């Protein structure tokens, strides 16, 4: 049994001078500083750049055409533009797989961590690796079981680009012009042709021994037709190699 000493009684007497305007100090003195529920910290999220494949229709007009770029602001509106100027800071790679939901279970994505190469096993958010894709090089794809083939086909290679982007003549979802400055963004490029097209920008910069952050890339889109007559769009990139962006400490 712990006996209260005279010294401790003296410290307790100090509490008779209670400063209600200094909660932190008083809570520490009274032993309740660690009893408050932890506050969930809200993370910082980047705007997401995507290609908008379908037009946004009004009652009798097209408000936003298909084949535009859209910039989704976290907890905010989405803006659209036919062209954009991207300043890439870096690229990373990951695997991604769409999982269809069922009754009571929503659709979701399985994603791996990002890395600077896909030549390694990457931990995914399902507790496995590579979204279930077998490790190593597959020499004979045709010899694999059909279930394994379907699994591999369902897993996307994703090139993740981070940097800043400026939409050219941006509009809101109603087609109204808006003022929008340069915005930090993340772009997950998963279409096979788009993966290669955007990758060519980084390949060209590497051959020039230039850093991505030193150059701007103009983004447009190119229409592709599906057998059923529908359209989808892939990025069209133009790297500005003549002008270099000055790097500052800001």
Identify the residue ranges that each predicted region occupies:
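Extended serine/threonine-enriched, polar tracts that run as long, contiguous segments within proteins
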Residues: 157-238
């Amino acid at each position: 049994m712990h006996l209260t000493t005279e010294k401790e009684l003296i410290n307790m007497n100090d509490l008779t001078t209670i400063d209600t305007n200094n909660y932190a100090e008083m809570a520490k003195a009274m032993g309740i500083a660690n009893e408050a529920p932890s506050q969930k910290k809200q993370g910082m999220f980047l705007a997401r750049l995507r290609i908008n494949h379908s037009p946004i229709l009004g009652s009798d007009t097209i408000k936003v055409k298909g084949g535009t770029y859209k910039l989704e602001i976290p907890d905010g509106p989405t803006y659209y533009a036919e062209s954009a100027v991207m300043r890439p800071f870096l690229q990373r790679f990951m695997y991604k797989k769409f999982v269809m939901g069922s009754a009571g279970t929503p659709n979701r994505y399985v994603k791996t961590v990002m890395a600077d190469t896909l030549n390694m096993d990457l931990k995914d958010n399902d507790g496995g690796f590579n979204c279930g894709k077998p490790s190593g090089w597959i020499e004979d794809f045709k010899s694999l079981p059909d279930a394994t083939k379907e699994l591999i086909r369902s897993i996307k290679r994703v090139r993740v680009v981070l940097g800043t982007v400026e939409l050219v003549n941006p509009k809101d979802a109603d087609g109204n012009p808006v003022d929008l400055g340069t915005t930090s963004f993340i772009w997950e490029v998963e279409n096979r042709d788009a993966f290669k097209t955007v990758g060519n920008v980084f390949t060209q910069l590497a051959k020039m021994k230039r850093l991505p952050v030193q150059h701007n890339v103009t983004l447009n889109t190119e229409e592709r037709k599906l057998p059923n007559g529908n359209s989808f769009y892939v990025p069209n990139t133009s790297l500005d190699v003549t002008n270099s962006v000055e790097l500052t400490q800001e």
